[in-house]
């Protein structure tokens, strides 16, 4: 293991010796690469220890400590009054996982880049780490990120990482607030449960968890963890969830971007970083809209991320799933507005992909085999489409299109028109 401060010395050295410094002025040299815009379609993968119960959502680790939830009830029934998340972590043994099988399915979907979650809010790293023992190499003997990276390379798919480390500061605080017998009260497993910091709920907007300020030690932890993720995985892209929009993260975000862009310069390629809620300067990274759309053509390429499942990003039993048609029209709408579409899959805890999601992926691939010319390497036309159905917000991606709704894309000498409502919706 290595200390946070020791690791951050390496980060400072890379920035000192690199092209990019940790200022917005220096980072504005960055340009979003054409390879990303031309890809237009990628996949997100939510899979980890939180997949084991298959209850509610990938937020099970938090919800299991929140009274009056299905996850709380499941915990009491299956783990006991003082049951803890460590018991779930120890049950994660995906004996049916096969990276090459995933890569084959993803390749057939027509996606060009794949982004497995590298660390979700639960704090479990899906790769080898020298900063925290709670990683899958220590837990299962597998570096799942490395295995997937190698499998994707064989298929010509670019490998991305997703980090949700920032939220671990408070994610499991219900263990301390609501379960007197939880081991989260002690220090033995502090590196698993995290700080469990509580909110001032009177200052927190619903769904934002912003009634709290991240302390310096956590900001350093986030930066070191993010840079280690880069170093150990060498991804082409990195996605951060929403909570880094807190103002105290700003200088650490700049350091991360400078580090990542400099390291990729060393490795010979230009990467992408995704952000939400205005936490990065426009042009220095790619703006992301979760489960939503915009209502105009964006000057800079942007990203929409959404899931095949309607109620969760991770696998849950009795979930409902979107149709291939619904996913295809979402892809079309995003691309017509100069966006790239990131569609999520939530494999089961055993490492298999459920039939419902596999069917959507393969059907999309069949559609793209016919229509991909109008998607890959396309540009927006002078207008994105016709009709009245449009949205300009997140968390609302279930539009019902009429036979008057069309979307357009463009290549030199060719305009592609997509009818957004069809009689056969498979």
Give the predicted meaning of each segment:
Residues 1-426:
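Mature catalytic domains of secreted/periplasmic carbohydrate-active enzymes
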């Amino acid at each position: 293991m290595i200390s946070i401060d020791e690791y951050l010395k390496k980060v400072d050295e890379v920035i000192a010796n690199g092209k990019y410094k940790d200022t917005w002025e220096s980072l504005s040299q960055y340009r979003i690469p054409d390879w990303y815009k031309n890809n237009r379609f990628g996949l997100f993968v939510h899979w980890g220890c939180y997949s084991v119960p298959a209850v509610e959502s990938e937020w099970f680790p938090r919800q299991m400590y929140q009274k009056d939830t299905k996850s709380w009830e499941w915990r009491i029934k299956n783990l006991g009054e003082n049951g803890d998340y460590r018991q779930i972590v120890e049950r994660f043994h995906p004996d049916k996982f096969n990276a090459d099988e995933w890569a084959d399915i993803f390749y057939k979907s027509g996606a060009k880049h794949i982004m497995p979650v590298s660390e979700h809010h639960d704090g479990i790293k899906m790769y080898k780490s020298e900063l925290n023992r709670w990683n899958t190499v220590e837990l299962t003997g597998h570096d799942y990120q490395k295995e997937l990276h190698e499998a994707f390379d064989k298929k010509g798919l670019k490998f991305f990482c997703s980090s949700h480390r920032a939220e671990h500061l408070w994610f499991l605080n219900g263990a301390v607030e609501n379960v007197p017998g939880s081991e989260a009260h002690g220090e033995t497993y502090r590196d698993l449960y995290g700080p469990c910091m509580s909110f001032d709920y009177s200052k927190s907007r619903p769904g934002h968890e912003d009634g709290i300020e991240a302390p310096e030690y956590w900001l350093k932890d986030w930066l070191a963890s993010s840079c280690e993720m880069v170093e150990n995985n060498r991804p082409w892209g990195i996605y951060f969830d929403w909570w880094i929009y807190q103002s105290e993260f700003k200088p650490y975000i700049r350091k991360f971007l400078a580090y990542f862009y400099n390291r990729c310069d060393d490795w010979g390629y230009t990467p992408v970083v995704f952000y939400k809620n205005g936490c990065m300067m426009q042009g220095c990274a790619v703006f992301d809209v979760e489960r939503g759309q915009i209502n105009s053509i964006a000057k800079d390429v942007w990203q929409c991320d959404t899931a095949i499942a309607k109620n969760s990003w991770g696998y849950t039993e009795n979930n409902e799933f979107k149709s291939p048609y619904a996913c295809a029209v979402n892809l079309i709408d995003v691309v017509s507005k100069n966006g790239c579409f990131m569609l999520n899959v939530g494999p089961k805890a055993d490492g298999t992909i459920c039939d419902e999601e596999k069917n959507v992926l393969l059907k999309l691939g069949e559609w793209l085999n016919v229509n991909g010319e109008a998607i890959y390497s396309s540009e927006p036309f002078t207008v994105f489409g016709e009709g009245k159905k449009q949205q300009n917000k997140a968390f609302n991606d279930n539009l019902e299109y009429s036979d008057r709704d069309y979307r357009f894309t463009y290549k030199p000498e060719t305009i592609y028109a997509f009818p957004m409502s069809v009689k056969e919706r498979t």
